Amino acid sequence: MKLFFRTAFLFAILFALSVCTAQDSYRVIFLGDTHYDAEDVNLHPEGISKAYPRDIEMWKERLPKLLTAANQKAAESNTAFVLQAGDMVEGGSGTAAAHKNMLEDGYKKLQSYFSVPVLTTCGNHDISTKIRKGEPYPAQIYEKFLQQNVLPALNKTEGIKVLSAFNNNHSSAKTNIAFRYGKDLYLLMNFNSYGPDLDKLKEVLEQNADARYKIILSHAGPLPWDRSWRPEWRLYGYVKMEKEKRDAALELFQKYNCIFLTGHYHGVSYLEYATEKGTIHQLMNSCVWTPDITENFAFKTTTPDNYGSRILATKIISREAAQELVNTFKPGIKKYYNGNGAGYMTLDLNDQNITVNYYHRDENTPSATFTITTK
């Protein structure tokens, strides 16, 4: 009997050690915008919008090839989950019920390609739909989608501990989710409108200051991408947002050396922003594989000196506002890579660093590699 208990105790210790090791060193698959759409009356009861025929065509062949390749990389390593950075669906459904169908169908379609959980966050297209009088608001539809799909996926994944779900500023819908996986903190963040409730965000980061990495999945990050189209469209960048809150959020992300995984602008980029207040790493990926995405990938720029040139070319905001953005952020830009691409990324996390590989289209060899350290 003593031998039995000793053996059982030994196996329990070995199992605990194996779980710790699995959560100390693991892989995450990172997907950008996927814009799911289909020719389905349940998604478009009033007829299909002709504005974005690319999405329906993309999902017929190109996206399945990309997702299949991403799943192969997931199977090659100790992969914990897939992170999708918002604009999971195209939107524009016409009714609340149709938009709910689109979110659920898009999520099921994505999940069907992977044997590990798919976790997503709210992009602008994910709440882009007409509503009729008496119907729930898009944010409420998305909140229910999270509760019925993403939260169950989190709760049944070994090693994940859900910490909280909280609302955006000026909204009651709980569309932000914080969780721990092993040593790391993850936030699924709703960047729309006024951004997450700043007090609740601060509380989550303070209570998890011991986390090895603080990784935030947000459709857009706090750093403006160097784009001429809507360069001010960023996390907490809403024009009616109080500047004090915007500045406080940026300092908070720097203080905790946050790593942002973003989408939105349909490209491949990496920014490292550092001042005496701390460092922010911001990655952008896109899965929008349109016919103009050529076979061979190369960054158009790889130097911080080029940051801001496209922001200054914008016609969307005033020249003064564009110059203020560049003056605010360019001095802190230490690394800047930017290119026109569509594909998937792998993040391999361990105690030393995070190795990021970008795979172009459906390739199985990386076209670019970054190493992120936060120490």
Label the predicted regions.
Residues T7-S18:
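Bacterial N-terminal signal peptides
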Residues Q23, L43, G47-K60, L198, ...:
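Active-site-proximal segments of metal-dependent phosphoesterases and phosphodiesterases across multiple
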Residues Y26, Y36-N42, S128, G195-L198, ...:
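Short, solvent-exposed loop/turn elements at domain surfaces
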Residues M1-R6:
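Positively charged n-region of N-terminal signal peptides that target proteins for export
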Residues G47-P53, S93-D210, G237-K240, E244, ...:
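Extended active-site neighborhood of metal-dependent phosphoesterases/phosphodiesterases
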Residues F30-G32, V82-D87, V118-G123, M189-N190, ...:
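Active-site neighborhood of phospho(di)ester-bond hydrolases with catalytic His/Asp-centered motifs
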Residues C20-A97:
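N-terminal active-site segment of His-dependent metallophosphoesterases
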Residues D24-R27, S77-V82, Y113-L119, Y181-Y186, ...:
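Loop/turn elements at helix/coil->beta-strand transitions in domains of secreted/extracellular proteins
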